[in-house]
UniProtKB/Swiss-Prot annotation:
Gene Ontology terms, MF aspect: RNA binding; structural constituent of ribosome
Assigned keywords, A-Z: Ribonucleoprotein, Ribosomal protein
InterPro entries, per database record: Ribosomal_Su5_D2-typ_SF, Ribosomal_uS9, Ribosomal_uS9_bac/plastid, Ribosomal_uS9_CS, Ribsml_uS5_D2-typ_fold_subgr
A single Gene Ontology CC term: cytosolic small ribosomal subunit
Protein name: Small ribosomal subunit protein uS9
Cited NCBIfam families: PRK00132.1
Length: 130
């Protein structure tokens, strides 16, 4: 018998997470590594687990994810977005809770481009009066 798997994608900054959610006991595997191995900081692990802890489904589903692009913070955010979307596919009654927490909304903030004549996006070169 084939196991039910729910697929969703999450995005944040330049990171894209492909998430497969299946009934299980709470294992989270990111890029073929354990989540504790992949995300060295506890804060990043908390971000990834947020949708599951909020909906009290932490030990009900296994998460397998492939993450590409960006840094660890962006990848954690993309993973959170993907897990939240997959949870809604698995159980549509969780949608209002996740929506209220803002986990279903794609964070539109991106890195601002560098402009010519400036050192960074907004940082101007030092001004000398004399």
């Amino acid at each position: 018998m084939a196991q039910i798997r729910y697929y969703a994608t999450g995005r944040r900054k330049t990171s894209v997470a492909k998430v497969w959610l299946s009934p299980g006991n709470g294992k989270i595997i990111v890029n073929d590594k354990n989540m504790e191995e992949y995300f060295p900081l506890e804060t990043l692990r908390i971000i990834v687990k947020q949708p599951l802890t909020l909906t009290e489904t932490l030990n009900k589903y296994d998460v397998i994810a492939k993450v590409k692009g960006g840094g660890l913070s962006g990848q954690a955010g993309a993973l959170r977005h993907g897990i939240a979307r997959a949870l809604v596919l698995a159980d549509p009654t969780l949608r209002p809770v996740l929506k209220k927490a803002g986990f279903l909304t794609r964070d539109p903030r991106m890195v601002e481009r560098k402009k010519y004549g400036l050192k960074k996006a907004r940082r101007a070169p030092q001004f000398s009066k004399r």
